[in-house]
């Protein structure tokens, strides 16, 4: 990945994170933090120069100190720890553990979007803004996209021991579709009907068919995979406005 590709794709991921946060909060500082921390974090993970990611990270830290509560800081601390553990030397890095790699990525994204946005209004009962189901949705979606990332990069040495590459594209696709369909059915039962959450997940599941076909043809790209977040978020927002 070239310097320009790393910069633009990291920025795109930052926009994806901000859009996901927008689904769960209208607080600009939380949305801005998700954008800056994801953008800077991915530049760091992609081993870009400090001058490329430090401005974004500095902006994120400034927002954290100025606007966030202790529960927010705790969540950010956990997410930052995962980021550091992901980048540790070979043998102890989360990046090099076949199954922990997609789990850690999914957990970090969930912390940095839905849980960070919902930290001050967490409820354990089904309601219009269900943190529990949204947490499951973002975690599952990110976990599956992490598998697709490894399949896209399967020719590279660092991805050859990944969970997705070991089980192959066919079984990875089955894991993806079965997981998404199970979550959608659970959501219909959980909310006692079709909601914006389940409709958005359905749209993301259909989009995964497109990702799968592109990877099979050797044309998968970071933008094609990451756009699944955009599809999910836009359908969520559109359906939300339709039912209001």
Regions found by a protein language model. Give the residues of each.
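Hydrophobic core segments of alpha-helical transmembrane domains in multi-pass membrane proteins
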Residues: 30-39, 72-84, 134-140, 196-206
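Functional transmembrane core segments of multi-pass inner-membrane proteins
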Residues: 102-154
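Solvent-exposed interhelical
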Residues: 34-58, 139-182
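Extended hydrophobic alpha-helices typical of membrane-associated regions
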Residues: 198-244
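N-terminal membrane topogenic signal
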Residues: 1-10, 50-51
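Small-residue-rich segments of transmembrane alpha-helices in multi-pass membrane proteins
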Residues: 12-19, 54-64, 102-117, 165-174, ...
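Intramembrane alpha-helical segments
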Residues: 42, 50-120, 208-212, 216
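Helix-coil boundary and interhelical linker segments in multi-pass alpha-helical membrane proteins
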Residues: 16-33, 61-75, 113-136, 186-195, ...
């Amino acid at each position: 990945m070239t310097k320009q590709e790393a910069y633009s794709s990291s920025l795109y991921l930052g926009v994806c994170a901000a859009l996901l946060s927008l689904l769960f909060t209208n607080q600009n500082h939380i949305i801005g933090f998700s954008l800056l921390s994801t953008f800077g974090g991915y530049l760091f993970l992609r081993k870009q120069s400090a001058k490329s990611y430090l401005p974004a990270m500095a902006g994120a830290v400034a927002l954290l100190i100025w606007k966030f509560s202790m529960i927010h800081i705790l969540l950010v601390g956990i997410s930052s720890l995962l980021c550091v553990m992901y980048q540790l030397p070979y043998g102890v890095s989360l990046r090099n553990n076949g199954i922990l790699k997609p789990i850690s990525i999914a957990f970090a994204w969930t912390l940095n979007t839905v849980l960070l946005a919902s930290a001050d209004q967490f409820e354990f009962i089904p309601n219009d803004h269900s943190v529990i189901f949204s947490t499951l949705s973002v975690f599952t979606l990110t976990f599956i996209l992490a598998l697709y990332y490894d399949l896209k990069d399967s020719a590279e040495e660092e991805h050859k021991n990944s969970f997705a590459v070991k089980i192959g594209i066919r079984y990875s696709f089955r894991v993806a579709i079965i997981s998404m369909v199970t979550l959608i059915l659970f959501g219909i039962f959980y909310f006692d009907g079709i909601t914006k959450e389940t409709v958005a997940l359905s749209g993301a599941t259909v989009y995964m068919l497109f990702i799968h076909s592109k990877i099979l043809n050797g044309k998968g790209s970071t933008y094609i995979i990451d756009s699944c977040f955009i599809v999910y978020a836009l359908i969520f927002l559109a359906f939300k406005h339709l039912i209001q």
